[in-house]
């Protein structure tokens, strides 16, 4: 455990950030899984709706600093490519 006052504060701040990032990453994986399930099922409408939702969550994760913007762009373009292959 830290002895310096500021480091004690940082430990608390880092724990809060860790939990927030964990929740955001978990939600990203969930939404991506839902999109993949819709694509596998061949349900174009559900896949399109889920693509929109997942893209929004990736953008939010970038805004919060949880993932890098290039990582989000890569994931989103991959999902878009899978969606476009459905047609």
Swiss-Prot record:
Lineage top rank: taxon: Bacteria
GO molecular function, one term: small ribosomal subunit rRNA binding
Keywords: Ribonucleoprotein, Ribosomal protein, RNA-binding, rRNA-binding
Pfam family, one: Ribosomal_S20p
InterPro entries the record matches: Ribosomal_bS20 (IPR002583), Ribosomal_bS20_sf (IPR036510)
Keyword RNA-binding belongs to the record: yes
GO cellular component terms, A-Z: cytosol; small ribosomal subunit
GO biological process assignments: translation
Family: Belongs to the bacterial ribosomal protein bS20 family.
Protein's job: Binds directly to 16S ribosomal RNA.
Record-given protein name: Small ribosomal subunit protein bS20
Species name: Corynebacterium jeikeium (strain K411)
């Amino acid at each position: 455990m830290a002895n310096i006052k500021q480091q004690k504060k940082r430990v608390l701040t880092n724990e809060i950030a860790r939990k927030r990032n964990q929740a955001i990453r978990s939600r990203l994986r969930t939404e991506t899984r839902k999109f993949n399930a819709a694509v596998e099922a061949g349900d174009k409408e559900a896949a399109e709706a889920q693509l929109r939702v997942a893209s929004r969550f990736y953008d939010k994760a970038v805004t919060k600093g949880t993932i890098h913007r290039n990582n989000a762009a890569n994931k989103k373009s991959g999902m878009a490519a899978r969606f476009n292959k459905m047609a």
